[in-house]
Amino acid sequence: MTVGTLVASVLPATVFEDLAYAELYSDPPGLTPLPEEAPLIARSVAKRRNEFITVRHCARIALDQLGVPPAPILKGDKGEPCWPDGMVGSLTHCAGYRGAVVGRRDAVRSVGIDAEPHDVLPNGVLDAISLPAERADMPRTMPAALHWDRILFCAKEATYKAWFPLTKRWLGFEDAHITFETDSTGWTGRFVSRILIDGSTLSGPPLTTLRGRWSVERGLVLTAIVL
């Protein structure tokens, strides 16, 4: 079992003492869900069960780093993960990757992470998930070797995951305009999600601009927003 560090490249160093992460690149044999979690996957196919179990295993590894004992990670009304008291976090999984980032609520408002295969989006998906301005800008700001459409999709997903716990409201793909910067390596960078709808939150300041990082490595795109 290999616990990797890919997601560390997209996390801010300034709050690392209040953040923890864990990631795996395969599903270790023998893992089982906690009893409270088992009903959530009772009718799931094997692939879905493995994703569910492994990503929650990652979450418990990360929580343990912050001194939180093992706890079930259930789902809210919209499918969002429900974290132990005093904690926030985000889960993601795709082919060849499962990852979790957690943080202490008194230091971190919200976390959104996403992982995707670094490959072109299926036909028709780009128009559905992007704004015309994004489709015009990204080819000019990304190196030709990068699948910028997938990076954009990954950033949109991270934006939603950071948004929803604070608002409990839907955020459509068209409701955030994302711009990107590329670092000197060409394989990492930053992005800014400008929210185009009412950003009022359940408590605290509204969400108007969310800032994150992206990285392409080992055939994967990773994005993260930490608020």
UniProtKB/Swiss-Prot annotation:
Job of this protein: Transfers the 4'-phosphopantetheine moiety from coenzyme A to a Ser of acyl-carrier-protein. Involved in post-translational modification of various type-I polyketide synthases required for the formation of both mycolic acids and lipid virulence factors. Acts on Pks13, Mas, PpsA, PpsB, PpsC and PpsD. Also acts on AcpM, the meromycolate extension acyl carrier protein. In addition, is involved in the activation of the acyl carrier protein MbtL and the nonribosomal peptides synthases MbtB and MbtE, which are involved in the biosynthesis of the siderophore mycobactin.
Give the consequence of mutating residue 116 to Q.
500-fold decrease in phosphopantetheinylation activity
The UniProt entry, under Pfam families, shows:
4PPT_N, ACPS
Task: Name a GO molecular-function annotation.
Answer: magnesium ion binding
Query: Mutating residue 114 to N has which effect?
Result: Abolishes phosphopantetheinylation activity
Instruction: List the catalytic activities from the record.
Output: apo-[ACP] + CoA = holo-[ACP] + adenosine 3',5'-bisphosphate + H(+)
Result of changing residue 56 to A: 100-fold decrease in phosphopantetheinylation activity
Query: Could you identify this protein by its name?
Result: 4'-phosphopantetheinyl transferase PptT
Q: Which residues cross the membrane?
A: none
Coiled-coil regions listed in the entry:
none
- Family membership, please give it: Belongs to the P-Pant transferase superfamily.
- Further comment: Identified as a drug target.
Name any cofactors this protein relies on. Mg(2+)
Tell me which UniProt keywords the record has, alphabetically: Magnesium, Metal-binding, Transferase
Q: How is its activity regulated?
A: Inhibited by the amidino-urea compound 1-[(2,6-diethylphenyl)-3-N-ethylcarbamimodoyl]urea (compound 8918). It acts by binding to the phosphopantetheine pocket in the active site. Inhibition by compound 8918 kills M.tuberculosis.
Q: Which residues bind CoA?
A: 48, 56, 75-78, 92-93, 114, 157, 161, 171
Q: What is its EC number?
A: 2.7.8.7
From which source organism is this entry?
Mycobacterium tuberculosis (strain ATCC 25618 / H37Rv)
| Binding, Mg(2+) | 114-116
